[in-house]
UniProtKB/Swiss-Prot annotation:
This is Uridine kinase. Belongs to the uridine kinase family. One of its GO terms (biological process) is UMP salvage. ATP binds at residues 12-19. It is an enzyme of class 2 (transferase). HAMAP family: Uridine_kinase. It catalyses: uridine + ATP = UMP + ADP + H(+); cytidine + ATP = CMP + ADP + H(+). It comes from Streptococcus uberis (strain ATCC BAA-854 / 0140J).
């Protein structure tokens, strides 16, 4: 009987459909002990910087994340202990004062652009997914999301994409594809891939329930 919780890593470029794929997996197991943890929650606290300095941070670089803290909390969850996950304020560009209590689960989905870039994170994962989506689709989705959800201007989004997001994708994110167990072209619309992933998860959950 399997007792250790499983961790599923889901990565891909910004706007590529990582969150949609993760939520599709979550929705497929409504009665299971399953949760999603986002790498974005672990952006470093920048309260000591001015707002102008925070805006200039390269948020697509590994150094923008407190991955050490994420690994520490994932290890606690694997031991069956609850953790308080930080909440990031995208408009203020720093951590908020709030945290989210995450209880231990049988399945933990770890989602983010760089979750396969760090070897220590990869070593915690049982299944690693790379959501592979066309560049044009990703930038359109990013524009819509950042304007509607994060209160950003079109000019700032385009400038960030051309100077930071695109170069970082080719330097860090795309190369991490080689570590993926499964590559999911076109994200959540790839029903066959999602079904295969869900079948694998269901078999693991069955082992836990025995």
């Amino acid at each position: 009987m399997r007792r250790k919780p499983i961790i599923i890593g889901v990565t891909g470029g910004s706007g590529g459909g990582k969150t949609s794929v993760s939520r599709a997996i979550l929705d497929s197991f409504p009665n299971a002990r399953i949760a999603m943890i986002q790498h974005d929650s672990y952006y470093k606290d920048q309260a000591h910087l001015s707002f102008e300095e925070r805006v200039k941070t390269n948020y697509d670089h590994p150094l923008a994340f407190d991955t050490d803290f994420m690994i520490e909390q994932l290890k606690e969850l694997l031991k069956g202990r609850p953790v308080d996950i930080p909440v990031y304020d995208y408009k203020a560009h720093t951590r908020s004062d709030k945290t989210f209590r995450q209880e231990p689960q049988d399945v933990i989905i770890v989602e983010g652009i760089l979750v396969l870039e760090d070897e220590r994170l990869r070593d915690l994962m049982d299944i690693k997914l790379f959501v592979d989506t066309d560049d044009d689709i990703r930038i359109i989705r990013r524009i819509k999301r950042d304007m509607m959800e994060r209160g950003r201007s079109l000019d700032s989004i385009i400038e960030q994409y051309t100077t930071v997001v695109k170069p970082m994708y080719h330097q860090f994110i795309e190369p991490s594809k080689r570590y993926a167990d499964i590559i999911v072209p076109e994200g959540v619309s790839n029903v066959v891939a999602i079904d295969l992933i869900n079948t694998k998860i269901a078999s693991i959950l069955a082992e836990i329930d025995r």
